[in-house]
Amino acid sequence: MKLAPYILELLTSVNRTNGTADLLVPLLRELAKGRPVSRTTLAGILDWPAERVAAVLEQATSTEYDKDGNIIGYGLTLRETSYVFEIDDRRLYAWCALDTLIFPALIGRTARVSSHCAATGAPVSLTVSPSEIQAVEPAGMAVSLVLPQEAADVRQSFCCHVHFFASVPTAEDWASKHQGLEGLAIVSVHEAFGLGQEFNRHLLQTMSSRTP
Protein backbone atom coordinates (compact mmCIF):
# COMPACT_ATOMS: atom_id res chain seq x y z
CA MET A 1 0.00 0.00 0.00
CA LYS A 2 1.04 3.62 -0.41
CA LEU A 3 2.27 4.93 2.93
CA ALA A 4 3.14 8.46 1.76
CA PRO A 5 -0.23 9.94 2.85
CA TYR A 6 0.29 8.59 6.36
CA ILE A 7 3.80 10.06 6.57
CA LEU A 8 2.54 13.42 5.32
CA GLU A 9 -0.34 13.50 7.77
CA LEU A 10 1.88 12.46 10.68
CA LEU A 11 4.31 15.26 9.87
CA THR A 12 1.45 17.71 9.53
CA SER A 13 0.05 16.69 12.90
CA VAL A 14 3.44 17.11 14.60
CA ASN A 15 4.07 20.49 12.96
CA ARG A 16 0.52 21.78 13.43
CA THR A 17 1.58 23.46 16.65
CA ASN A 18 4.52 25.78 16.03
CA GLY A 19 7.55 24.40 17.83
CA THR A 20 6.26 20.91 18.59
CA ALA A 21 8.63 19.21 16.15
CA ASP A 22 11.62 21.01 17.68
CA LEU A 23 10.52 20.10 21.19
CA LEU A 24 9.72 16.45 20.48
CA VAL A 25 13.18 14.89 20.17
CA PRO A 26 14.79 16.59 23.21
CA LEU A 27 11.72 15.73 25.28
CA LEU A 28 11.81 12.08 24.21
CA ARG A 29 15.50 11.83 25.05
CA GLU A 30 14.90 13.22 28.52
CA LEU A 31 11.90 10.97 29.16
CA ALA A 32 14.01 8.00 28.04
CA LYS A 33 16.14 8.56 31.16
CA GLY A 34 13.16 7.32 33.15
CA ARG A 35 12.32 10.38 35.19
CA PRO A 36 9.98 13.39 34.96
CA VAL A 37 11.16 16.35 32.88
CA SER A 38 10.74 19.87 34.24
CA ARG A 39 9.85 22.76 31.97
CA THR A 40 13.01 24.49 33.17
CA THR A 41 15.13 21.54 32.02
CA LEU A 42 13.42 21.51 28.64
CA ALA A 43 13.83 25.26 28.21
CA GLY A 44 17.53 24.95 28.97
CA ILE A 45 18.08 22.15 26.46
CA LEU A 46 16.19 24.00 23.74
CA ASP A 47 17.58 27.42 24.67
CA TRP A 48 14.01 28.74 24.65
CA PRO A 49 12.41 31.21 27.04
CA ALA A 50 10.08 29.56 29.54
CA GLU A 51 7.13 31.30 27.94
CA ARG A 52 7.74 29.60 24.60
CA VAL A 53 7.98 26.16 26.18
CA ALA A 54 4.74 26.81 28.06
CA ALA A 55 2.97 27.99 24.90
CA VAL A 56 3.93 24.89 22.91
CA LEU A 57 3.01 22.51 25.71
CA GLU A 58 -0.31 24.26 26.23
CA GLN A 59 -1.31 23.39 22.67
CA ALA A 60 -0.03 19.80 22.95
CA THR A 61 -3.03 18.75 25.02
CA SER A 62 -2.05 15.06 25.16
CA THR A 63 1.00 15.82 27.29
CA GLU A 64 1.03 14.01 30.64
CA TYR A 65 2.19 15.68 33.87
CA ASP A 66 2.88 14.64 37.43
CA LYS A 67 1.43 16.45 40.46
CA ASP A 68 4.34 18.91 40.42
CA GLY A 69 3.75 19.93 36.81
CA ASN A 70 6.70 18.00 35.39
CA ILE A 71 6.26 16.23 32.07
CA ILE A 72 5.99 12.45 32.35
CA GLY A 73 4.62 11.55 28.93
CA TYR A 74 4.40 12.61 25.32
CA GLY A 75 4.39 9.55 23.06
CA LEU A 76 6.91 7.97 25.43
CA THR A 77 5.54 7.87 28.97
CA LEU A 78 6.36 6.88 32.52
CA ARG A 79 2.75 5.80 33.06
CA GLU A 80 1.81 2.21 32.31
CA THR A 81 0.17 1.50 28.95
CA SER A 82 -0.31 -1.59 26.78
CA TYR A 83 3.01 -0.90 25.02
CA VAL A 84 6.06 -1.77 27.12
CA PHE A 85 9.24 -0.06 25.92
CA GLU A 86 12.38 -1.25 27.72
CA ILE A 87 15.71 0.48 27.20
CA ASP A 88 18.89 0.15 29.26
CA ASP A 89 17.02 -1.94 31.85
CA ARG A 90 14.43 0.81 32.30
CA ARG A 91 10.77 0.00 31.77
CA LEU A 92 8.98 2.80 29.98
CA TYR A 93 5.78 2.79 27.96
CA ALA A 94 4.48 4.19 24.68
CA TRP A 95 1.10 5.48 23.59
CA CYS A 96 0.76 3.24 20.52
CA ALA A 97 2.38 0.56 18.38
CA LEU A 98 3.87 3.03 15.90
CA ASP A 99 5.52 5.03 18.69
CA THR A 100 7.54 1.96 19.67
CA LEU A 101 8.80 1.67 16.08
CA ILE A 102 9.62 5.38 15.69
CA PHE A 103 11.28 6.34 18.96
CA PRO A 104 14.44 4.16 19.05
CA ALA A 105 15.91 6.10 16.12
CA LEU A 106 15.01 9.45 17.69
CA ILE A 107 16.53 8.64 21.08
CA GLY A 108 19.44 6.59 19.75
CA ARG A 109 18.69 3.49 21.81
CA THR A 110 17.56 -0.08 21.13
CA ALA A 111 14.26 -1.00 22.78
CA ARG A 112 12.71 -4.30 23.71
CA VAL A 113 9.01 -3.91 22.95
CA SER A 114 6.21 -6.10 24.26
CA SER A 115 2.45 -5.79 23.99
CA HIS A 116 -0.64 -7.83 23.11
CA CYS A 117 -2.62 -8.45 19.95
CA ALA A 118 -5.51 -5.96 20.02
CA ALA A 119 -7.90 -8.60 18.68
CA THR A 120 -6.97 -11.79 20.54
CA GLY A 121 -4.87 -10.66 23.50
CA ALA A 122 -2.00 -12.93 22.45
CA PRO A 123 1.45 -11.64 23.47
CA VAL A 124 3.60 -9.95 20.83
CA SER A 125 7.18 -8.75 21.12
CA LEU A 126 10.11 -7.48 19.10
CA THR A 127 13.43 -5.68 19.43
CA VAL A 128 13.63 -2.28 17.76
CA SER A 129 17.00 -0.66 17.12
CA PRO A 130 17.52 2.72 15.46
CA SER A 131 18.00 0.98 12.11
CA GLU A 132 16.14 -2.36 12.16
CA ILE A 133 13.69 -4.65 13.90
CA GLN A 134 14.58 -8.14 15.11
CA ALA A 135 13.19 -11.04 17.13
CA VAL A 136 9.64 -10.38 15.91
CA GLU A 137 7.23 -12.74 17.68
CA PRO A 138 5.00 -13.84 16.09
CA ALA A 139 6.80 -13.38 12.79
CA GLY A 140 3.68 -12.25 10.92
CA MET A 141 2.90 -9.37 13.28
CA ALA A 142 0.81 -6.52 11.84
CA VAL A 143 -0.04 -2.92 12.74
CA SER A 144 -3.19 -0.88 12.22
CA LEU A 145 -2.89 2.69 10.92
CA VAL A 146 -5.35 5.55 10.61
CA LEU A 147 -4.99 9.02 9.15
CA PRO A 148 -4.34 11.56 11.93
CA GLN A 149 -7.19 13.99 12.43
CA GLU A 150 -6.94 17.75 12.87
CA ALA A 151 -7.17 17.64 16.63
CA ALA A 152 -4.96 18.92 19.42
CA ASP A 153 -5.28 15.59 21.24
CA VAL A 154 -3.20 13.35 18.97
CA ARG A 155 -3.41 10.52 21.46
CA GLN A 156 -7.19 10.34 21.22
CA SER A 157 -7.47 11.00 17.49
CA PHE A 158 -4.60 8.77 16.31
CA CYS A 159 -2.74 6.72 18.91
CA CYS A 160 -5.82 5.01 20.33
CA HIS A 161 -6.38 3.27 16.98
CA VAL A 162 -2.80 2.18 16.18
CA HIS A 163 -2.31 -1.33 17.54
CA PHE A 164 -0.22 -4.48 17.17
CA PHE A 165 -1.85 -7.68 15.90
CA ALA A 166 -0.57 -11.25 15.86
CA SER A 167 -1.06 -11.53 12.09
CA VAL A 168 -2.35 -9.65 9.05
CA PRO A 169 -5.49 -11.84 8.73
CA THR A 170 -6.33 -11.24 12.40
CA ALA A 171 -5.85 -7.51 11.92
CA GLU A 172 -7.94 -7.46 8.75
CA ASP A 173 -10.78 -9.20 10.56
CA TRP A 174 -10.57 -6.55 13.30
CA ALA A 175 -10.51 -3.79 10.67
CA SER A 176 -13.69 -5.14 9.05
CA LYS A 177 -15.47 -4.33 12.31
CA HIS A 178 -14.00 -0.81 12.60
CA GLN A 179 -14.69 0.64 9.17
CA GLY A 180 -15.71 4.01 10.60
CA LEU A 181 -12.06 4.92 11.23
CA GLU A 182 -10.78 7.27 8.52
CA GLY A 183 -7.96 5.85 6.44
CA LEU A 184 -7.85 2.61 8.41
CA ALA A 185 -5.21 0.30 6.97
CA ILE A 186 -3.41 -2.86 8.00
CA VAL A 187 0.31 -3.25 7.29
CA SER A 188 3.02 -5.69 8.32
CA VAL A 189 5.19 -4.63 11.24
CA HIS A 190 8.09 -4.28 8.77
CA GLU A 191 6.08 -1.86 6.63
CA ALA A 192 5.12 0.10 9.73
CA PHE A 193 8.78 0.30 10.76
CA GLY A 194 9.64 1.60 7.29
CA LEU A 195 6.97 4.27 7.64
CA GLY A 196 8.47 5.25 10.98
CA GLN A 197 11.96 5.51 9.49
CA GLU A 198 10.67 7.75 6.71
CA PHE A 199 8.79 9.90 9.21
CA ASN A 200 11.95 10.28 11.29
CA ARG A 201 14.00 11.27 8.25
CA HIS A 202 11.55 14.01 7.30
CA LEU A 203 11.16 15.18 10.90
CA LEU A 204 14.91 15.54 11.43
CA GLN A 205 15.28 17.31 8.09
CA THR A 206 12.57 19.76 9.11
CA MET A 207 14.33 20.43 12.40
CA SER A 208 17.76 20.93 10.80
CA SER A 209 16.33 23.30 8.20
CA ARG A 210 15.16 25.57 11.03
CA THR A 211 18.43 25.45 12.94
CA PRO A 212 20.33 28.73 12.49
From Swiss-Prot:
One GO BP annotation of this record: response to mercury ion
SUPFAM superfamilies the UniProt entry points to: NosL/MerB-like, Winged helix' DNA-binding domain
Entry-linked Gene3D superfamilies: 3.30.450.410
Keyword hit for Chloroplast: no
EC numbers, comma separated: 4.99.1.2
Enzyme class, broadest EC rank: lyase
UniProt keyword list: Lyase, Mercuric resistance, Mercury, Plasmid
NCBIfam families, sorted: lyase_MerB, PRK13239.1
Function comment: Cleaves the carbon-mercury bond of organomercurials such as phenylmercuric acetate. One product is Hg(2+), which is subsequently detoxified by the mercuric reductase.
Family to which this protein belongs: Belongs to the MerB family.
Protein name per Swiss-Prot or TrEMBL: Alkylmercury lyase
Originating species: Escherichia coli
Organism ancestry: Bacteria, Pseudomonadati, Pseudomonadota, Gammaproteobacteria, Enterobacterales
Annotated gene: merB
